[in-house]
Amino acid sequence: MALISQRFATREKLILVGLYLSKYDRLGLQRLGFGSFTEAFNVIGYAMGSRPASIKNYRDEFDPLFPNRRKGWHKRPLRRYCLKVFEEYKSLDLESFAGLVKSFFGYDENAWSEVQEKEDEEESESQFAKRLITGLTAEQYFQSIHHNLSEFEGYSLENTTRLGCGYDFRLRKNPGGDFLAVEVKGLKERTGNLSLTPKEHQLATALRDRFFLFVVKNFQESPFHEIFSNPLSGRLQFKKRETLTVHISWLTRV
């Protein structure tokens, strides 16, 4: 079955994630690299621009249909639009269903599996969750609450994550005026390590008080955030780390 994620509306994606988590339970969590349902609800919910509780509710809705330990919403019939999704996708095997869920976030399961060694499979599973936490999920979290933050009150928001400019968001009060740059990082736990790329470090040095490091922590339980203005001159202590990378290519003459 060819599954193209672009044809799904957001609500249908949420329903499908709920169905996946209900059907495959903890095996499904492991296949996506999550350690708990709470972590999966938080990470996927925010990444989709929705509430974590929405995914939990859809999982609970499907629970009476599967032999897991949860009772779910067993006292009411399945809603019509959920039943429609269930009937269409209930037969998906674990690999296909996990690949579909990953495709919602731009992860091409089939392309990667062609070159992936078996011993890398476990690492690949954990990398999916890690990349969501450190990337899209943290960015969507920031977008969902930035208008409530006093530091950015009255500023318009521009998403620059695809521009490669050394920060994730640009905020301005007036068109053409000075802007604030916000680099967003995400952590699974309450504490952890994070790094700045050379470009991010360069921009933080140049912009000083106009550069903000926004760190979302504890996605495994209950996310919260910390904001660091001019992070290179505050209480954070950065240590330079140099890594030698070997690039290999194959050349020919025609």
Which role does the model predict for each range below?
Residues 75-132:
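Interdomain/boundary linker segments immediately adjacent to catalytic/signaling cores
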Residues 142, 146, 167-171, 180-188:
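Conserved catalytic cores of phosphodiester-cleaving nucleases, focusing on short active-site segments
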Residues 122-156:
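Acidic-basic catalytic patches of nuclease active cores, encompassing PD-(D/E)XK
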Residues 156-172:
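Beta-rich nucleic-acid/ligand-interaction surfaces
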Residues 184-234:
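Catalytic cores of nucleic-acid endonucleases
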Residues 3-27:
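Short, Lys/Arg-enriched anionic-surface-contact patches
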Residues 26-45:
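Short, charged amphipathic recognition helices of the HTH superfamily
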Residues 48-66:
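Major-groove recognition helix of helix-turn-helix-like DNA-binding domains
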